[in-house]
Design a protein with these regions (language model features):
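A conserved hydrophobic helix/loop-capping motif in glycosyltransferases and polysaccharide synthases
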Residues: 9-17
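Short, well-formed alpha-helical segments that are part of the catalytic scaffolds
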Residues: 17-32
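Active-site-proximal specificity loops/subdomain of glycosyltransferases
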Residues: 22, 34-76
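C-terminal catalytic/acceptor-binding lobe
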Residues: 24, 141-217, 221-291
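Short beta-strand-to-loop acidic/aromatic patch adjacent to the donor-nucleotide binding site
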Residues: 71-89
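Conserved donor-nucleotide/metal-binding helix-loop-beta segment in metal-dependent transferases, i.e.
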Residues: 88-111
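A recurrent flexible, glycine/aromatic-enriched loop bordering the glycosyltransferase active site
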Residues: 103-119, 126, 135
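Aromatic-glycine-rich donor-binding/catalytic loop that engages nucleotide-sugar donors
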Residues: 119-137, 146-157
Length: 291
């Protein structure tokens, strides 16, 4: 059987966000209902270990997995990097497909390439991907810098800023674990831990199945509003689309997070990063930093 090459692939990084993943999966079936199911695939890039979440690396590993799966075609496939808590509110809001030389930015901040954006696999590889920052912050800022450095066009003709009603954004906790080194490294353009610095990578790709317990509950009352809502949701659940989980079982980067110093910051009240505030041993242990 011939391998069907998708036109675009969603790469959705996450760790410990099962509810958001379920919401994303079900709602995207509605959003993508008018698309040919062979045109796109969704990959949830899942960091399974207890180390701080490395959002840049999970995105990079999503790319590596696609390069390995489609070695002859990945450069021309559109990659849609999409946060797990962010998705369009309405069908056909975005035309995801792009071409070499153009990056489409759909949602986020103008000063960073985060939220939702599209880039070809070839352009992403040329930019050396995201920095593999352990903890939270600045990988999206660095990605925009790299795109501009390589003289790629950033197309914001379909762009919606943060808090736009055209995009659903399920906010997570504002508490962030941030490396003391990242703000200084960003200012000095000194992010050297990138796509080409991921080692000892081990991952598996599994089919993703969205379940809905209400569908099989014999106690459901068909005249009950809650039951009817659950059944409506289940109609979406039964729609088939190509969804997979990249379970990242092991990887190393140039920077070892066990050797980093982190601090915890509430980014709702203090939006500017505040380095040189040190984490205590209790918090480090809680974040999996005590090896």
């Amino acid at each position: 059987m011939d391998l069907i090459i998708p036109k675009f692939i969603f790469i959705v990084p996450y760790r410990n966000r099962e509810k958001e993943k379920t919401h994303f999966s079900i709602y995207m079936k509605y959003i993508m209902e008018d698309h040919d199911k062979n045109d796109y695939e969704i990959y949830y890039s899942h960091q399974t270990d207890l180390r701080p979440f490395n959002r840049g690396a999970t995105k990079n590993i999503g790319f590596i997995a696609m390069k390995n799966k489609y070695p002859d075609h990945y450069k021309n496939i559109t990659l849609v990097f999409n946060d797990i808590d962010t998705l369009p509110a309405f069908k056909n809001t975005f035309n995801y497909i792009t071409s070499s030389g153009t990056v489409k930015h759909f949602y986020g901040f103008h000063f960073a390439l985060g939220g939702i954006f599209s880039i070809t696999g070839g352009d992403f590889e040329q930019c050396n991907g995201f920095p593999n920052n352990w903890g939270w912050g600045l990988e999206d800022n660095a990605m925009l810098d790299r795109v501009l450095l390589h003289e790629l066009n950033v197309d914001r003709n379909q762009f919606h800023p943060i808090n736009s009603k055209q995009v659903i954004h399920l906010y997570d906790t504002p508490q962030r674990l941030v490396s003391n080194n990242d703000p200084g490294n960003y200012i000095k353009k000194n992010f050297i831990d990138n796509l080409d610095k991921i080692y000892e990578l081990n991952y598996t790709i599994a089919n993703h199945i969205t379940s809905n317990d209400a569908h099989n509950d014999p106690h459901n009352d068909p005249h009950n509003d809650a039951t009817n809502h659950a059944n409506d949701t289940n109609k979406l659940t039964l729609i088939h689309q190509k969804e997979y989980i990249i379970n990242i079982e092991h990887f190393r980067t140039l920077v070892n997070p066990a050797n980093e110093i982190f601090y915890n910051q509430n980014t709702f009240y203090a939006k500017k990063l505040l380095p040189n505030v040190y984490e205590n041993s209790v918090r480090r242990s809680r974040w999996g930093l005590k090896f």
